[in-house]
UniProtKB/Swiss-Prot annotation:
Taxonomic source organism: Schizosaccharomyces pombe (strain 972 / ATCC 24843) (Fission yeast)
Gene: mug123
Keyword annotations of the record: Cytoplasm, Meiosis, Nucleus, Phosphoprotein, Sporulation
Protein name: Meiotically up-regulated gene 123 protein
Residues modified as Phosphoserine: S180, S187, S189
Phosphothreonine sites (modified residues): T191
Length: 235
């Protein structure tokens, strides 16, 4: 009985006695003098390294290979049908890479390619056109009512500019305010009358303050010059 037990232990590769211990591995390293890793030494001793041997073995059998091949064929057919239905570039225009039709305009696709929205800085030209249109549509009436003969005479026969018109309108309003205490309306729009009245008041007050300051400066210069001359005479 003991002989049978020893034989079965030697024949069975999974028995504990067949597995090398750490002492045996160390002794093998010392005796051989080679630098084998732990796994390599276990493989040399024909020991089982714990891996997927139990899972791999049934897959290599003939029935499992047949079933896997059949499953692969059916799955590939299903995937191919799905791809042809969903990812068809001819019917749906789905491009996984940049197609050659986008490089040339003759072969361009029929569907329109959407351009990105322009930012505020890129669309200045469109905004300026819109502003010009809006200003031309909502032009004030008092510009057309200004006498063009005065502007043309001052600009030597050229067309009257907006600056010239504004200057003449201010000059006319100043003359009106200096001649009469009240404000006479020249244009039919009340908003323009109020604006020109306020502008004339501000300009007249600023001009008077400038004139006063200039006169005071001249007086100071005269006084200082006279004082300097007196000092020189006394010397």
């Amino acid at each position: 009985m003991e002989r049978l037990a020893t034989r079965s232990s030697h024949d069975d590769p999974y028995s504990r006695s067949s597995l090398p211990t750490s002492n045996a591995i160390n002794s093998n390293h010392e005796s051989n003098g080679s630098t084998f890793s732990y796994v390599q030494s276990l493989r040399r001793a024909k020991a089982t390294v714990w891996s997927d041997i139990g899972r791999v073995a049934p897959l290599h059998s003939s029935p499992s290979i047949k079933s896997s091949s059949q499953n692969g064929k059916s799955s590939s057919k299903g995937l191919g049908g799905m791809r042809s239905r969903v990812f068809s570039s001819q019917h749906h225009g789905v491009y996984h890479t940049r197609p050659a039709s986008l490089h040339s305009r003759t072969m361009a696709p029929q569907h329109t390619i959407l351009t990105p929205r322009l930012s505020a800085t890129e669309g200045k030209d469109d905004d300026e056109d819109e502003l010009v249109i809006s200003t031309s549509n909502t032009a004030p009436t008092y510009i057309s009512m200004i006498e063009s003969s005065r502007a043309s005479s001052t600009h030597s026969g050229t067309a009257p500019s907006i600056m010239g018109m504004s200057i003449h309108s201010r000059a006319d309003s100043r003359a009106e305010t200096t001649q009469s205490d009240g404000f006479e309306s020249r244009s039919g729009s009340p908003t323009h009358d109020i604006q020109s009245y306020l502008v004339n008041r501000r300009s007249s007050s600023s001009e008077s303050s400038d004139e006063d300051s200039a006169e005071e400066g001249m007086k100071r210069l005269v006084i200082t010059n006279m004082g300097d001359n007196d000092e020189f005479d006394s010397d």
